Amino acid sequence: YKFYIISVVLVVTFSVGGYFFSEKVKSNQIQAAKVLYEDWQVTSVQEDREELFQNLTENYSDTGYSHLALLKRGSDLAKENNLEESIDVFYQLKENSDGFFGNSLINGIARTNIARISIALGNFEDALKVLEKYSNDEDAYTHELKGDALTGVGNDDLALKQYQNAFEKYKDNGLKNLVQLKINNLNTYE
């Protein structure tokens, strides 16, 4: 019976020690990512910026600083109308923030941006695929995006339902008016 007590004590000791060790490693990793992110933000030499960005997003891909860098890069590329490269960055962000221990907020932002860009590029099936995770979503904008993608693939009946869901959930009258225009546009083609 002494063996069992010693075994339990050892297991608990190793578990607690392992937990604190992993937390320390995680803390050090976040601190290193923070330094890289801050350096990336202030560096003006393009080659240095790119090297810092690659280091941050490849070696610290599961940190919030890497997610922020990818979000900023993807958004900047989209503003410059470099949609193909932008969507690649958002796919990387989606992959890095996905999963059980991922960041669902960042993942949702990445998916929304992928869908928006896919629709702009005419890749409606890709938009639907990336939004599939949100099949029961309560967000009005997600319903609107699904409606846009469904319209693009010619499924006007489902698009109309998505637009109606968006219309019901939007609180802002300007957004409601925009969705109402989309609904009216679909109804004129019936």
Locate each region found by the language model:
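Single-pass alpha-helical transmembrane signal-anchor segments
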Residues: 1-24
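Short solvent-exposed coil/turn linkers within tandem alpha-helical repeat scaffolds
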Residues: 4, 58-66, 95-107, 133-142, ...
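Alpha-helical segment of the N-proximal tetratricopeptide repeat
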Residues: 31-64, 72, 76-79
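Alpha-helical adaptor scaffolds
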Residues: 71-141
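TPR/TPR-like (Sel1-like) alpha-helical repeat modules
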Residues: 90-95, 136, 156-174, 184
